[in-house]
């Protein structure tokens, strides 16, 4: 089966909901559904998607550098990547002033180079590696999976959690060792030498996480998140899903996709609110002032300062983008969850338009 084809692809699938049909045809726009049972091509697709994401990050960073105006506040220029790099302490001097754009250029270039490496990996997995890892030899065979195999899905979940944990740990190392973070309270970049390790303080933010105003607490929270993610990753790699989990969860491609989309939707809603109101992780100097919620055709976050017509702060762009993307991810979660449970949307179409039956 080709990774991309102009003609429909036929898949005999136990992973996706087929409503009893043995052969289901997917056109090119169906994406990963075309090779849902080909574990090798599934990896190729994900590596290619990672390459595109990293390429966008690198290219857009360089684009924002070309558009940056030092005489205007960064938060009022509609930038979305440079503010993140500034918050991490790159190229920032006293008072939150950008004193050096070169670190941003390096980061953009590194992302472009990384995207090329990932793209090469995607091409390798597409054209040279086995399309079905069950036929592979050596360690590669270990990453073959079936959608109805909870043990193997748990191993893959474990590896995902490890990468997320290492990502959280990298932020901790950046804050405590590699140059520090920008402190919006002091308007300077500093090392976080005494992160909060009291679990009661960290857990206390469960009810008001968006009000956090201490970098020590922020970094301490990431330490706990890193520990939990890495420990969870090791657990899922070594321990198959327990009996209660096997009974509670559904193990098929449609259900796994719905779980993933639901998790992304939750993260998106949380990020939207956090970005809209928090000025520690999203300093006013780089993102503009906090937003207010307004209601139009749909809820949205609005700027609280006067800007020229059609212009918005970085905070407004990010908060609204996260909110609306999370909303559509939530719809995808519900769609695939219902399909996983056997709901046939074509029956709904027939119910609403009886003429279809004829």
Swiss-Prot record:
The keyword Thylakoid applies. It holds the Pfam family PSII. Keywords: Chlorophyll, Chromophore, Membrane, Photosynthesis, Photosystem I, Stress response, Thylakoid, Transmembrane, Transmembrane helix. Its cofactor is chlorophyll a; all-trans-beta-carotene. It is found in: Cellular thylakoid membrane. GO terms for biological process: photosynthetic electron transport chain. Its main location: membrane. Chlorophyll a. The chain crosses the membrane at residues 40-60, 79-99, 104-124, 219-239, 255-275, 318-338. GO terms for molecular function: chlorophyll binding. It comes from the Bacteria. Under iron-starvation forms a complex with PSI trimers, where the trimer is surrounded by a ring composed of 18 IsiA subunits. This is Iron stress-induced chlorophyll-binding protein. It comes from Thermosynechococcus vestitus (strain NIES-2133 / IAM M-273 / BP-1). The lineage of its organism: Bacteria, Bacillati, Cyanobacteriota, Cyanophyceae, Acaryochloridales.
